[in-house]
Amino acid sequence: MLSHRCVEILPRSGLQSGVSFFSDPLPSDATLIAEVPPSEQPQLFCHRRQTDQLMVLRGSFDLIVLQNRQLRRITLREDEATWVRIPAGVPHGAINRSCHSVVIVNAVLQHGPSDPRDYLPRPVPRSLLTQWEALIAGDD
């Protein structure tokens, strides 16, 4: 049985019309365009009452999620367009290894008012520090 707090990877769907692709919309309360700058010191964040639904529009980055007491790397790229749904309560962060900002869309689902603590970095659990450092370094 899957937990309601599992990260999901969803295929992009839509309509190809000539040279243009029109993506099907995801249900959301707000749609945000964000830039993820090159990362020197990536950090984890955790939204208490918000589900993020992310897709890369330009560039690529590694999304790191902390789930079931394990760190997981999910590489998101513009040429492999997929949605990643990160439920509320799942710590996550981005590692942009390029020298350019990555542009993403976030189809946000709100489950209540935002909490100022959602935007404060969370510590990486001590037992996962070695794995965290390897992920930052780009080691598998």
Region spans (language model):
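Non-catalytic, conserved peripheral segments adjacent to functional cores
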Residues: M1-W83, C99-D140
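Asparagine-centered strand-capping/turn motif at beta-strand->loop junctions
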Residues: A94-R97
